[in-house]
Each structure stands twice: as C-alpha cells, then as structure tokens.
Design a protein with these regions (language model features):
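Gram-negative outer-membrane beta-barrel transporters
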Residues: 75-88, 102-184, 253-257
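Outer-membrane beta-barrel proteins
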Residues: 11-13, 23-29, 34, 78, ...
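C-terminal beta-signal and adjacent terminal beta-strands/loops
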Residues: 22, 179-181, 199-258
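Structural signature of outer-membrane beta-barrel channels/translocons
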Residues: 5-7, 60, 70-74, 85, ...
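Hydrophobic, lipid-facing positions within transmembrane beta-strands of outer-membrane proteins
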Residues: 1-4, 53, 63-67, 78, ...
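Solvent-exposed loop segments that connect transmembrane elements
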Residues: 28-55, 92-100, 138-146, 221-242
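Short sequence motifs at beta-strands and strand-loop junctions characteristic
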Residues: 56-61, 104-108, 149-154, 188-191, ...
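Membrane-embedded beta-barrel scaffold of Gram-negative outer-membrane proteins
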Residues: 7, 13-15, 41-43, 49, ...
Length: 258
C-alpha cells in the first residue's frame, strides 16, 4: 500500500492512494465438487473429489486506486473521492451445484463517492448527505459488460436533517438504494427507507431511541432479490428466497459510560 496527502490550504487536503491485494474465492465452494455413492446408514459416501494438491486455490490480484479531496470548515465539512479497482480474474458461480470457478476474464469496479455535512450558523439545525455511485464490469471476449447482479453492488445515497438542542439530538434520514442490472438481463429493484434516530442525555447516562423504516416501506432486500437468481429453480420456487425487509421497527437503549 502507498499513499500521499497534500495540504492545499489550512482547511483543504487532497490525497492519492494505491493498494494491491489478493482476493480468495470461497474454499468450500471452490473445492466443493464431488461424486457420492448410494446412501449407507443414512450417509452418502464420497467416491471422488477435487485433489487440493493438484488444484491450488487461485488468488485474484486486485489493484485499487483512489483520488480524493476534502474540506473542513467551521460549518461545512465535505469530501469527494474517485476510485478505480481492477482484477486479473473473475469469480463465476455455477447455479446448478453452487460451486464456483475462477476465470481469466478481467474485472473492474469504479465510481465516485462523497459526503457533505452543514451546520446552520446560530441554530441547532444541520443537514447532510452521502452517496456512492459505482459501476462493476467484466471483460468478456474483449468487451466490457455489466457484472452479474448476484455479485455486483448497487449505488446508494443518503440524505439527513438533524436538530440538536441540548440535551436532545434528533435526526431523520432517508436512504435510497438504486436499481442494478447486468448483461444477462437480470435486475435488482431499488428501494427507499426513512429512519428516525434520537437521543436524550440524562444526568446519569444517555437514552437512545429509534424508529427504523419509519414509513413502513414494503420492500425486498438486495439479498432477497439475489437469492432467487442463485437458488431457483434448482432448489425450489423463487418465493422461498424473497426475503422482505423489516417493517417499522422501534428501538430503545440506555447507556452509561463510567
């Protein structure tokens, strides 16, 4: 890993980072290929399997680059970064037996992420937000195509408004998960949730309370949309894997630091 930070002014910095690492596929799925005989006493005897010595686990080399800028003011704090990562191989899932293979197709993920917080002068109000917009692609036959939605991540954005008159701290935030599609025509549907988070400082300790999914949005989680693509119809109807997100959820907590 290597990085450099330049102080443009007292309140502004820019940076560049480079890192190189190795991503390993799931060993259980990579080596989980075998032939089994007839059941004996309720167990299936393993007849043959992948020889680990003859099939070493292939590492995927990942190079990552990031260029960013930040500003820290009295009332405004913001930062912006662009990133780009490349991989020399790609993981592919066999949806018949759920094993995986490592292919020589290259992969790249790139995007822009940022955040901003603004504290309104002479008031207890503040606003802010953050976002991460990205694309994930694999190179197939010399052409870059969208990566499989069962592996790629969707773009996200969050916006919030806060009010913090001492000893209260209240915040309402909205998170948007955007649609995602791949080269095979599969699609994940985005959704929006709103949360309310608050706290009250007591003479001894602090009470924290929350209402997640304040508007009781009916949605299917990202995993709940990926799972049917992975497991259905081989392992049953898609309805078995459509995991819904939690509805309106209340939380209450008391904490004491000593």
């Amino acid at each position: 890993n290597a990085g450099i930070v330049a102080h443009l002014t007292e309140r502004q910095q820019t940076w560049f980072n480079f890192s190189q690492g190795v991503e390993l596929p799931d060993p259980g799925k990579y080596y989980g290929i075998g032939k089994y005989g007839a059941a004996v006493n309720g167990h299936l005897p393993l007849i043959s399997s992948v020889n680990v010595d003859d099939s070493p686990l292939q590492g995927i080399k990942v190079n990552s680059y990031e260029l960013g800028w930040r500003y820290t003011g009295d009332n405004l704090r913001t930062q912006l970064a662009a990133y780009y990562s490349t991989s020399d191989k790609t993981i592919v899932v066999n949806r018949t037996d759920m094993t995986i293979d490592v292919q020589s197709d290259k992969r790249r993920i790139y995007g822009v992420e940022g955040a901003v917080d603004y504290f309104i002068p002479d008031s207890d109000w503040s606003v802010g937000g953050n976002f991460n917009v990205l694309k994930s692609q694999v190179q197939t036959d010399g052409r870059w195509q969208k990566w499989d939605v069962t592996l790629a991540s969707p773009s996200k954005a969050t916006a919030w408004v806060g009010w913090a008159p001492d000893p209260w701290s209240l915040r309402v935030q909205s998170q948007q998960v955007f649609d995602l599609s791949d080269a095979a025509g599969n699609k994940l549907e985005g959704y929006n949730t709103v949360d309310f988070i608050g706290s009250y400082a007591l003479p001894v300790g602090k009470v924290t309370f929350s209402i997640e999914n304040l508007l009781n949005e009916d949605y299917v989680t990202i995993w709940g949309q990926r799972a049917p693509l992975l497991y259905s119809p081989t392992y049953g109807s898609s309805s078995l894997y459509e995991y819904k997100g939690r509805g309106r959820t209340f939380g209450l907590n008391y904490a004491l630091t000593f």
